[in-house]
């Protein structure tokens, strides 16, 4: 099991150096929550929890990242459990996320195994160039939205 904490100001530089915090500006501007997974006092994964999601209006898990060496070891499960607990603690009923319909089958299988189901909305095609950490990144993907009731 991995310890999961909310990102603290004193940890930003250390975490960002190892695990790029792609939504750090959004986190600072909107009061969203960055969750950090730790193993032996080292950051090994993160997830961004936007309290008002971009598509469904529900709290939305975004920007999940786990160090490649620790994928399929329970880090993402620990991050998901922590996000769900925060949503429950605020008295909210559901949490959502989007995942690639075609190019990220392992993540989709993970979320479905955790109880996320298709939200019943039309998949969204994302195409173009985005900037992550100052670098251009070409995107051409179709996202499906999943939802989980946490109460």
Predicted regions and their residues:
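Conserved acetyl-CoA-binding loop of GNAT-fold acetyltransferases
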Residues: 111-121
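Terminal substrate-recognition subdomain of acyl/acetyltransferases
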Residues: 124-151
């Amino acid at each position: 099991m991995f310890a999961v904490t909310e990102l603290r100001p004193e940890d930003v530089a250390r975490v960002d150096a190892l695990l790029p915090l792609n939504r750090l500006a959004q986190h600072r501007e909107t009061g969203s929550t960055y969750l950090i997974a730790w193993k032996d006092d080292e950051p090994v994964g993160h997830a961004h929890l936007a309290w008002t999601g971009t598509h469904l209006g529900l709290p939305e898990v975004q920007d999940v990242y786990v160090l490649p060496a620790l994928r399929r070891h329970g880090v993402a499960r620990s991050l998901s459990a922590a996000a769900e607990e925060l949503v429950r603690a605020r008295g909210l009923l559901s949490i959502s996320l989007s995942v690639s319909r075609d190019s990220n089958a392992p993540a989709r299988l993970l979320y479905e195994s955790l109880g996320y189901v298709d939200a019943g909305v039309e998949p969204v095609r994302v195409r173009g160039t985005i900037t992550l950490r100052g670098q251009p990144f070409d995107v051409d993907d179709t996202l499906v939205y999943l939802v989980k009731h946490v109460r």
